[in-house]
């Protein structure tokens, strides 16, 4: 890592957050293209620079973009530059790719330095996607409302550029970024993010979008922290927590004697914030009036501070007891588990009804069947079909693919409260595998299974690694083992979502 810092000479650039000198490094563009540059690329037209500064790199790119614009104005019908033989936006795309590498360097250094610290071992477990579900089990059962907000996307390029102003101090880098963005996107908006990623450098776009999102989150979390320190009573006069500083001070000075014995009634609100796939999720124990206020805080913050148009209909409020939250491939909701306790005092006995709130996590079976149908494993009704594109592969490869998909889904959805949906997914993949092999050998499913025997699909029924470990700890038929199989299991080695799970 020290050699990497010396190679990029970051000590001088990072001291004042000056990134502009790094733009003139040839190897920055080699890093941007993963050393996949060939001799036809303009970066290697001058190979004698080595590790020296070369202002000709960016200057040549800018000049060619300027010459290219003149050619475009004279030949708008051509999608290919007739002189240079490159696409219209190639040169600005090259600058954008190099800039994407440069702006990620400071954050990469911070991440590496943090991972080498004392907290590295502790933070490893929190990298797993499943690590958030034990937190939800502990917290969500005590909350009342959940607020889901679709994060609006910037409608103008300047909004994305301005997100970098607070930590990039040199104006030259921002001017160059702004110039390349406007030239490359031709003043197009970013209203539709998926379409924009397809026409723009994905690495730089995601960095700019995340920087913009983190900026609004920092302001929101500041408001949330301020409101959490503002202690309120149940009086309707003090429901506005954002502007509570003066009220609390006035309350403490004037009514201190009257409320001295009741100050313990003040309590902090329970607010938890999560961002996931373009959504902001806010769960709270507050009343419906306060959660509605947070809804309008979201909309006003986006519209008046970040100049983002957001309709109030894009922000939904639901009660956790009546709503299932679609989150990370699970449908999470709060369920009441009733229980009856028999109590006896002297000669009198009576029954006590007790309901305990628990987090219920279920598999969104309809969405996963839709993903399996899109991947040609089944039809829209969930009936297994053959996978014709895999029919040319060897039998062992076909079986290995299906088994790997089945085990990955089983591993990811091990935290489901109800295993019936998981068994249905396994059934679809199992018979899709059989139909694919029968199609390859030009046979029927029944004849194919009769020929090979029932042990042919034993790969789908064999124990997973986790089940094997549990079977070593608990004896066969032990009650605790059956309870573990039926219960939820969260693993700390899942760092990405399966494509079939990521249905949205």
From Swiss-Prot:
Compartments reported by the entry: Plastid, Chloroplast
A Pfam family annotated for this UniProt entry: MatK_N
Source species, domain of life: Eukaryota
Coiled coil location: none
CC per GO annotation: chloroplast
GO biological process, one term: tRNA processing
Signal sequence residues: none
UniProtKB keywords: Chloroplast, mRNA processing, Plastid, RNA-binding, tRNA processing
UniProt-listed InterPro entries: Domain_X, Maturase_MatK, Maturase_MatK_N
Main subcellular location of this protein, as a coarse class: plastid
A GO molecular function held by the record: RNA binding
HAMAP family: MatK
PANTHER family found in the cross-reference section: MATURASE K
Role summary: Usually encoded in the trnK tRNA gene intron. Probably assists in splicing its own and other chloroplast group II introns.
Family assignment from sequence similarity: Belongs to the intron maturase 2 family. MatK subfamily.
Name the record gives this protein: Maturase K
Species whose genome carries this gene: Gossypium schwendimanii
Source taxonomy: Eukaryota, Viridiplantae, Streptophyta, Embryophyta, Tracheophyta
